[in-house]
Amino acid sequence: MSKTLAQNDALSVTLFAFDKGEEISTHESGGDAFVTCLDGTGRITIDGVPYELHEGESIVMPARHPHAVYGQEQFKMLLVVVF
């Protein structure tokens, strides 16, 4: 589930909720993406390297680098992309 909270040519803010085992497959974005885990545990893979993200933790996914998101359990995250 995702809900776009704000979007324009320079910025996108989206709330995501994943069930356990749900994922967004590997892709690239034209903007730098800042992810904050709001609840649960997720795995963010950037350039093939996995990072486990817990509630309150954040990570940056650089523009034009392949990345993916996986819900290791129910997982909520806020995604802010700056173009």
Q: For each predicted feature, which ranges?
A:
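A short glycine-rich, His/Asp/Glu-containing loop-to-beta-strand
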Residues: M1-E22
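A cytosolic small-molecule/anion-sensing beta-strand core signal
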Residues: L38-D39, H54-E55, E73
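Short, conserved beta-strand element in jelly-roll/cupin
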Residues: A17-D19, G30-I44
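Short acidic-glycine-tyrosine-enriched beta hairpin
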Residues: G48-A63
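Ligand-binding loop in jelly-roll beta-barrel domains
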Residues: A63-F83
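A generic "binding-loop/recognition-motif" signal
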Residues: L11, K20, G30, V49, ...
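Short, surface-exposed secondary-structure edge patches
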Residues: L15, F34, V49-E52
